[in-house]
Swiss-Prot record:
Taxonomic source organism: Syntrophus aciditrophicus (strain SB)
Originating gene: rplR
Subunit structure: Part of the 50S ribosomal subunit; part of the 5S rRNA/L5/L18/L25 subcomplex. Contacts the 5S and 23S rRNAs.
UniProt-recorded name of the protein: Large ribosomal subunit protein uL18
UniProt keyword terms in alphabetical order: Ribonucleoprotein, Ribosomal protein, RNA-binding, rRNA-binding
Annotated GO MF terms: 5S rRNA binding; structural constituent of ribosome
Length: 121
């Protein structure tokens, strides 16, 4: 786990980011969670309080494609997966919620993968 100082900085950053963005049914919030081994993403409609779609490195559709790849490449595939799911539902635009994480590394790779599949931020 991160040190108390780092966690406090992350909490402040998360509050600052979340205060500025909100998702709707037409344009959901794409929320990212990153652990040491996996990355998770979900599309949330804040006006309804529901998760519309989700994907992660432990999802069956992604897990089969990411054997023997680095974490950044796995994150990119998760981004492609969530983009395909949302496109099938007729959603073209989202609001990207990086949470408390810097837009760098796996978080950036996830966003790039989603953009490659045609999702607009």
């Amino acid at each position: 786990m991160a040190s108390k100082k780092v966690q406090k900085i992350r909490d402040k950053r998360k509050a600052r980011v979340r205060a500025k963005i909100s998702g709707s049914t037409e344009r959901p919030r794409l929320s990212v969670f990153r652990s040491s081994k996996h990355i998770y993403v979900q599309a949330v409609a804040d006006n309804e309080g529901k998760t519309i779609a989700h994907s992660s490195t432990i999802s069956d559709d992604v897990k089969s494609k990411i054997t023997d790849v680095k974490k950044v490449e796995a994150a990119k595939e998760v981004g492609r997966s969530i983009s395909r799911k949302l496109r099938d539902m007729g959603i073209q635009e989202v609001v990207f919620d990086r949470g408390s994480y810097l837009y760098h590394g796996r978080v950036k790779a996830l966003a790039d993968g989603a953009r490659e599949e045609g999702l607009k931020f």
